[in-house]
Amino acid sequence: MKTFVPIALLAYLCGSIPFGFILVKLFLKADVRQTGSGNIGATNVARTGAKGLAVLTLLLDAVKGWVAVFAATIFIARVSNPANVDVRLIPAFAGLCAILGHLYPVWLKFKGGKGVATALGVFLALAPTPIGIVLGLFALVVLLTHYISLGSILAAAAFPFVVYFLYRNQYPAATYAIMGASSLLIIWRHRSNIQRLIAGTENRFPASKPTEGKA
């Protein structure tokens, strides 16, 4: 427990840095939460018209997820079997905490983004090869349907299965459970998108006119 608490706290705080909010406030003197869906992620930052800031938000949100996992990996490399647990759990646990930080940032009254970019960084740090496959799936879905939300949902759902298929017994069962929980969180945060996909009212990409409540 003494091992997991500081890792959880640091990873959460790293993930909770609201780069989209900060960049829009800094460069546009505006509150991105007052635009489009009110989300702080890259998709909503793009709705401000600042495409460069949207790309930077995407990159920084991914980097913070990667950093959380990398820092946990460095930690277990320097400590001999901390807390007598399987050390392979710790990077995945840190990644989950970073995603939670992005979804529920303490700085913004626990109202954050949908976690796709942060999860990308986390998953890239945990298992780079599966990320290539999952990104291919995302790109294919968006290319065929023009729904970014659908691509994100399916990519998140596929990741733990792709990891298991490629690595089988290289990770303990708890690690796959943590990866699965991370994916479920992302899908849960897209529940309004799922409702619009079912209703046929979800915006396509590129959309000619943003719709309130979009991801």
From Swiss-Prot:
Entries under Pfam families matching the protein: G3P_acyltransf
GO cellular component entries: plasma membrane
Compartmental location: Cell inner membrane
Catalytic reactions on record: an acyl phosphate + sn-glycerol 3-phosphate = a 1-acyl-sn-glycero-3-phosphate + phosphate
SMART domains, per the entry: G3P_acyltransf (SM01207)
EC number: 2.3.1.275
Pathway recorded for this protein: Lipid metabolism; phospholipid metabolism
InterPro entries registered for this protein in UniProt: G3P_acylTferase_PlsY
TM spans (from-to): 4-24, 56-76, 90-110, 122-142, 147-167
Keyword Lipid biosynthesis applies: yes
Entry keyword set: Cell inner membrane, Cell membrane, Lipid biosynthesis, Lipid metabolism, Membrane, Phospholipid biosynthesis, Phospholipid metabolism, Transferase, Transmembrane, Transmembrane helix
Membrane topology, from the record: Multi-pass membrane protein
Chief subcellular location: membrane
Molecular function (Gene Ontology), one example: acyl-phosphate glycerol-3-phosphate acyltransferase activity
GO biological process: phospholipid biosynthetic process
Function: Catalyzes the transfer of an acyl group from acyl-phosphate (acyl-PO(4)) to glycerol-3-phosphate (G3P) to form lysophosphatidic acid (LPA). This enzyme utilizes acyl-phosphate as fatty acyl donor, but not acyl-CoA or acyl-ACP.
HAMAP family, alphabetized: PlsY
Quaternary organization: Probably interacts with PlsX.
Family the entry assigns: Belongs to the PlsY family.
Protein name: Glycerol-3-phosphate acyltransferase
Organism: Koribacter versatilis (strain Ellin345)
Designated gene of the protein: plsY
